[in-house]
UniProtKB/Swiss-Prot annotation:
It is a multi-pass membrane protein. One of its GO terms (cellular component) is glycosylphosphatidylinositol-mannosyltransferase I complex. This is GPI alpha-1,4-mannosyltransferase I, catalytic subunit. It comes from Xenopus tropicalis. One of its GO terms (biological process) is GPI anchor biosynthetic process. Pathway: Glycolipid biosynthesis; glycosylphosphatidylinositol-anchor biosynthesis. Its main location: endoplasmic reticulum. PANTHER family: GPI MANNOSYLTRANSFERASE 1 (PTHR12886:SF0), PIG-M MANNOSYLTRANSFERASE (PTHR12886).
Length: 419
C-alpha cells in the first residue's frame, strides 16, 4: 500500500506529470498525421483545415472570411499564420501547450483556494483526461478558451482587477459565451458585505425584496465592479472596432451574429434542434431561435444569485447550464465546463459509486445519440426524430448530473486579499 502511495506521489510531481502529458499529446498529433494519410476516417478536425485556410488567406493579404465556414475572430487566424510559414502542425502543438497551461492554472487556482495537498491530483484529472487530449491534438482551439477563462478566474480570485478584466474582454472577443460570467464576477467582488451589515441582515429577515434589489444595484455600482466592467468593455470594444475596420460587416456577421441564428441540424445534442429544423423556412424561425435563450437566461440569473460566493463553482454551473440548454450543442462544447470541473471536485461530497454512475450515464446518453446520428450522416437515413429524442434524454441526464453536483457540493468561499 505504501509502495503504491509512493508511486502515486512520484507520478503527481510536476516534473513527471507535465512532460508525460505533453508526450502523450504529441504522440497523438503524430498519429493523426499517419491516420490522415492512410485511413478513410481522418483524425484532424475539419475546423483545423478551416483555420489553416483562413490563415493562408491572411498571408496573401485578403480577408480570412474568404474561407467559407470560417466563423471565428480573425485573431485566431492571425495566431495560426505559422501554419503556413513553419509547419501545419504548429497550431496543434499550440493547442496542446494551451492544454498544459490550463492544467497549470487549475493547480494555481486550487492552491490559492487552500487546496494544496490534492491540487496536483485534480490537475492530473485534466492532464490525462482523454477528451481534451484528443480534442487539442485533432486541432480544435477550445484549449485556448480554457486558458483564457481559467486566467480570468485566477486573477479575479486574487483581486487583480486590471489583468482579469483585460483577459475577460479578450475571452469574450474570442467566444461570446464567457459574457455570462459578468454577473457572478460582479457579485463576487461584493461577497463579503453583499447584503450590507446590520441593515442588510434586517432586510433579509424582513423579506423586503424591493430593498434587496435596490441594495444589489447600489453594490453593483461599486468602484471595483465599474473598473472591471470598463476595462473589459473597452478591451472588447477596441478589438471589435479594429477588426471591423479591417474586415467590415463580414467580421461582425461571422464572428458574432452568425452564432445567434446558427442552426446545426445534424451534429447537435440540443433539445431545440428538431423544432428549429422543422421551422427553418418559417417566418418566425428567427424569433423562435432567440426565444430559446430565455430558459438559459433565467437559470443563469438564479444560479448567479445563489452561488456567486464560490466563483469557480458558479462559473462551472453557468457553463454546464449554458451548454446543456443551448440551441446548438456539440461535443467540443463539453470542454467549456470540463476545464472547470477540477476546480469543483474538491468540494464534492459524493460517494465514488455515485460519481461513477453519473459518469457512465453521461457517456451512455452520448452513445444513444450517436447511433441515429451515424445512420443519418453515413447511411442517409431519416433519423431526425430519434436524434431529437436522444437529445432530450441527454438534456435530462445532464440536468440530473447538475442537480446531483449542486446537492453534494460544499460551498467554498475562501477570502482572498487584494494584491
Amino acid at each position: 500500500m505504501m509502495k503504491q502511495a509512493g508511486i502515486l506521489k512520484i507520478f503527481l510531481q510536476h516534473q513527471f506529470m507535465f512532460p508525460t502529458a505533453f508526450f502523450l499529446r504529441s504522440a497523438l498529433v503524430l498519429f493523426g498525421v499517419y491516420q490522415d494519410q492512410t485511413m478513410l476516417v481522418k483524425y484532424t478536425d475539419v475546423d483545423y483545415h478551416v483555420f489553416t485556410d483562413a490563415a493562408e488567406y491572411l498571408t496573401q493579404g485578403v480577408s480570412p472570411y474568404k474561407r467559407a465556414t470560417y466563423r471565428y475572430t480573425p485573431l485566431l487566424a492571425w495566431i495560426l499564420t505559422p501554419n503556413i510559414y513553419v509547419t501545419e502542425l504548429y497550431g496543434k502543438m499550440l493547442f496542446v501547450c494551451c492544454d498544459l497551461l490550463a492544467a497549470y492554472l487549475i493547480h494555481r487556482i486550487l492552491v490559492d483556494r487552500g487546496i494544496k495537498d490534492s491540487a496536483s491530483l485534480y490537475c492530473a484529472i485534466w492532464l490525462f483526461n482523454p477528451l481534451p487530449m484528443v480534442v487539442s491534438s485533432r486541432g480544435n482551439a477550445e484549449s485556448v478558451l480554457a486558458v483564457l477563462v481559467l486566467s480570468v478566474l485566477y486573477y479575479v480570485q486574487k483581486r487583480r482587477l486590471i489583468k482579469g478584466a483585460l483577459i475577460y474582454g479578450l475571452s469574450v472577443h474570442m467566444k461570446i459565451y464567457p459574457i455570462t460570467y459578468i454577473l457572478p464576477i460582479a457579485l463576487f467582488f461584493q461577497k463579503e458585505d453583499f447584503y450590507g451589515s446590520q441593515e442588510g441582515k434586517r432586510v433579509v429577515s424582513n423579506l423586503k425584496y424591493i430593498r434587496i434589489f435596490r441594495n444589489l444595484l447600489q453594490r453593483l455600482l461599486s468602484r471595483d465592479i465599474l473598473l472591471f466592467v470598463t476595462v473589459s468593455g473597452v478591451t472588447f470594444a477596441l478589438l471589435t472596432l479594429f477588426f471591423y475596420y479591417r474586415y467590415g460587416w463580414e467580421f461582425l456577421e461571422n464572428t458574432y451574429l452568425y452564432h445567434l441564428t446558427r442552426r446545426d441540424i445534424r451534429h447537435n445534442f440540443s433539445p431545440y434542434f428538431y423544432m428549429l429544423y422543422l421551422t427553418a423556412e418559417n417566418n418566425n424561425s428567427f424569433i423562435l431561435g432567440l426565444a430559446a435563450f430565455f430558459p438559459q437566461l433565467v437559470l443563469l440569473f438564479v444560479v448567479s444569485l445563489a452561488y456567486f460566493k464560490d466563483l469557480p463553482f458558479c462559473c462551472f454551473l453557468h457553463t454546464a447550464i449554458f451548454v446543456s440548454f443551448n440551441k446548438v450543442c456539440t461535443s467540443q462544447y463539453f470542454l467549456w465546463y470540463l476545464c472547470l470541473l477540477p476546480l469543483v471536485m474538491p468540494g464534492l461530497k459524493m460517494s465514488m459509486t455515485n460519481g461513477i454512475c453519473l459518469i457512465i450515464l453521461w457517456f451512455f446518453s452520448q452513445a444513444i445519440w450517436l447511433v441515429p446520428a451515424y445512420f443519418l450522416e453515413f447511411e442517409g437515413q431519416n433519423t431526425f426524430l430519434y436524434i431529437w429524442c436522444a437529445g432530450l434524454l441527454f438534456l435530462l441526464i445532464n440536468t440530473v448530473i447538475i442537480v446531483q453536483i449542486i446537492s453534494n457540493y460544499q460551498l467554498q468561499s475562501k477570502k482572498t486579499k487584494k494584491t
